[in-house]
Amino acid sequence: MIYIFDFDGTLVDSMPTWSGVHVNALKSAAIPVPDDFVQTITPLGNYRASQYTISLGLDVSLESYLDFVSKTLYEAYTTRIELRSGVKEKLSELKAAGHSLNVLTASPHHYLDPCLRRHGIYDLFDKVWTIEDFGYTKAQTIIYTEAAQRLDASIDRCVFVDDNATAVETAKKTGMYTVGIFDETSKDFAPQLKAVSDLYIEDFSQIPSL
């Protein structure tokens, strides 16, 4: 089978840091944070997430805000962000079983790749992609169909694993088998994630070898 993994909140325990940059920017400016803010920005990537955050009322240029976000996250991902429990062991198990492992994330290569290398799992993946490699967000079905095409795989042989309900629901629309994984940051949306997933799990070790 072809496994396609999200990164933030799925492989690494990073969502409090990643979303926190934007949440704290709004709070520091005394701007109310929408209830669905984290769920909304998660599939978008840094650029569109920054655009959306600024649109809520931040008095800052997009260029300066992007620079702030980039520097803050680079430091965190290259030094502090840790793998979720059981990730390395499960990935190694799936790889040994002959499955193709891949990453598709909204996070950019400049801190995605160093983080995967720091934890010694980069070479387990056949492809490590960000949405920048496609020009689409994870809220668009075309990114999943194109990923399957690039992997020379039929959609029904693809297993997509993500903690975001929007991304999971979108991937499922293409015919991929979807695994929703619980993440504490988006616990309020766990019922929604469970509803749109073919399989819902709470721990990475529960990912099946299909």
What would you call each of these model-derived segments?
Residues M1-E93, A97:
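N-terminal helical cap/lid subdomain that shapes the substrate entry/recognition surface
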Residues M1, S92-K95, P108-H109, D113-L210:
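Asp-based, Mg2+/Mn2+-dependent phosphohydrolase catalytic module
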Residues P32, S100, Y177:
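Residue-level detector of anion-binding/catalytic polar loops
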Residues E63, I81, A106, T137-K138:
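Non-catalytic, surface-exposed connector residues within folded enzymatic/regulatory domains
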Residues L11, L83, L101, Y136, ...:
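Conserved SAM-binding loop
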Residues H22, L73-E75, S100-V103, I131-D133, ...:
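N-terminal start-of-chain detector that recognizes signal peptides
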Residues T10, T105-S107:
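Conserved phosphate-coupling serine/threonine residues in phosphotransfer and NTP-handling enzymes
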